């Protein structure tokens, strides 16, 4: 059976491939190999620039051709690496051998080939390649989609800023609010957590077999290898080098990044559920597309499927993000191999995340505001002005105002405009205060 959209096991690579395809440039096996080659090549160039004595005669004009090894790397190249891995049974060693083949193709580089992967362990490559790919994926794909969602919410908040709406706390009528303000709550929350994500450092482990530069130091004790590593990771890769490690990354900062993404996802789940409720309450209708079917049995159905799809995908994403953030920082002694297979799954929750964000955006863009229903609910819930009345009566030193309004409104009898106004007329307050109270309605008692 050939692998395609219909035979893929994961819906990320099957049903939803159209939404996640860009992530293949960062988290596929091909992408991981390309990032590994990039780190190996840049490391070799950095050794030349140092320079190590054996590399001082390397022709700097060839740096461009070296970088072309990863810049022009394609699926055929990746297939060759996998072919080599079939012999070595070691993925990073296969990358090293592939690069040596490319050096041979350039020609004249035989004296320099043994400085490919010099002094390094596999995790010096993996623990730079993975955070580098994550950094690029967040910058190029995930963050722009979150920004697009924030922009859509901000636009709606402005459009609906003057639309009064009955609030619900504990599922019951509460002091009125404005629809635009409630939408802005989500834009504000997402922006705060997006800022938090941007502040997270993406760190890398780079220090040899057990994090001490043993091989580097024994071969060239005259060099400051920590300073070299700091500069290489920062200037060549745009990451921050972890100063104290075992053979592998501490993964604490990676965990913080994943937790930051999870907080963003949690806010979107909250958004999805609220808009699902607003649609259920008929505060919004949904645009109907000709030919679409809402139910295999009930022809009339127009379901909020986009928000439901988003919520489901975010649930999967957050479960994996939480597992990754909790598992990766834990490794036996100087390392065990459990992080290796786990790291390969970083793209999975991000795939579900981008599917979800696109679904939420699709759902939002199908909304049709039903002001008539929103207004009718306000007209039907005059009890919510009780807070306003009792607060003004407190200001006027009226005796037991809260209790008076409680006795009036906390019953099983419906409160109407007439009921409220009759209560106000019977109050022992000035005509000016009565007029002030009479002016309060569920439509204008919306705060600031």
Report each predicted region and the residues it spans.
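A helix-coil-helix interface module used to build multimeric assemblies
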Residues: 1-213, 220, 224-232, 294, ...
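Generic, well-ordered alpha-helical scaffold segments in large soluble proteins
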Residues: 42-47, 98, 102, 137, ...
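Short amphipathic alpha-helical segments with heptad-repeat character
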Residues: 135-143, 147, 154, 184-187, ...
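Alpha-helical coiled-coil oligomerization motifs
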Residues: 158-161, 202, 276, 283, ...
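Glycine-rich anion/phosphate-binding loop at the beta-strand->alpha-helix junction
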Residues: 193, 240, 246-332
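Active-site-adjacent "gating/activation" loops or surface patches in catalytic cores
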Residues: 223-247, 251
């Amino acid at each position: 059976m050939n692998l395609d959209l219909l035979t893929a096991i994961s819906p990320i690579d099957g049903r939803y491939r159209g939404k996640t395809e860009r992530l293949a440039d960062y988290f596929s096996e091909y992408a991981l190999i390309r990032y590994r080659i990039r780190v190996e090549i840049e490391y070799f160039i950095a050794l030349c620039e140092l320079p190590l004595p054996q590399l001082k005669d390397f022709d700097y004009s060839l740096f461009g051709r070296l970088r072309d090894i990863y810049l022009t790397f394609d699926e055929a190249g990746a297939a060759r690496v996998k072919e080599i891995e079939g012999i070595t049974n070691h993925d990073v060693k296969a990358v090293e051998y592939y690069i040596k083949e490319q050096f041979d193709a350039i020609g004249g580089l035989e004296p320099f080939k043994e400085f490919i992967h010099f002094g390094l362990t596999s995790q010096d490559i993996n623990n730079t390649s993975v955070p580098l790919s994550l950094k690029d994926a967040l910058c190029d794909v995930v963050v722009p989609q979150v920004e697009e969602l924030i922009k859509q919410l901000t636009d709606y908040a402005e459009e609906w800023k003057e639309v009064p709406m009955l609030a619900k706390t504990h599922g019951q009528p509460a002091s009125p609010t404005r629809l635009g303000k409630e939408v802005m709550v989500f834009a504000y929350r997402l922006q705060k957590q997006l800022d938090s994500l941007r502040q997270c450092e993406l760190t890398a482990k780079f220090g040899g077999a057990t994090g001490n530069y043993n091989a580097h130091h024994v071969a060239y004790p005259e060099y400051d290898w920590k300073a070299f590593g700091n500069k290489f990771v920062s200037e060549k890769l745009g990451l921050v080098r972890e100063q104290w490690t075992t053979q592998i990354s501490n993964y604490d900062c990676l965990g913080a990044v994943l937790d930051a993404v999870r907080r963003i996802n949690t806010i979107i789940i909250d958004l999805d559920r609220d808009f699902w409720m607003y649609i259920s309450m008929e505060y919004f209708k949904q645009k109907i597309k000709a030919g679409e079917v809402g139910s295999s049995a009930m022809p009339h159905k127009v379901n909020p499927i986009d928000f439901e799809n988003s919520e489901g995908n975010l649930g999967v994403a957050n479960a994996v993000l939480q597992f990754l953030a909790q598992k990766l920082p834990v490794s036996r002694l100087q390392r065990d191999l459990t992080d290796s297979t786990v790291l390969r799954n970083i793209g999975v929750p991000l795939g579900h995340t981008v599917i979800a964000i696109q679904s939420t955006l699709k759902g939002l863009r199908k909304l049709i505001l039903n002001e008539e229903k929103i207004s009718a609910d306000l007209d039907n819930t005059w009890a919510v002005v009780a807070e306003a009345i009792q607060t003004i009566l407190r200001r006027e030193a009226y005796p037991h105002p809260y209790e008076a309004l409680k006795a009036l409104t906390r019953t099983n009898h419906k409160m109407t405009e007439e009921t409220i106004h009759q209560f106000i007329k019977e109050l022992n307050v000035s005509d000016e205060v009565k007029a002030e109270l009479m002016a309060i309605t569920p439509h204008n008692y919306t705060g600031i």
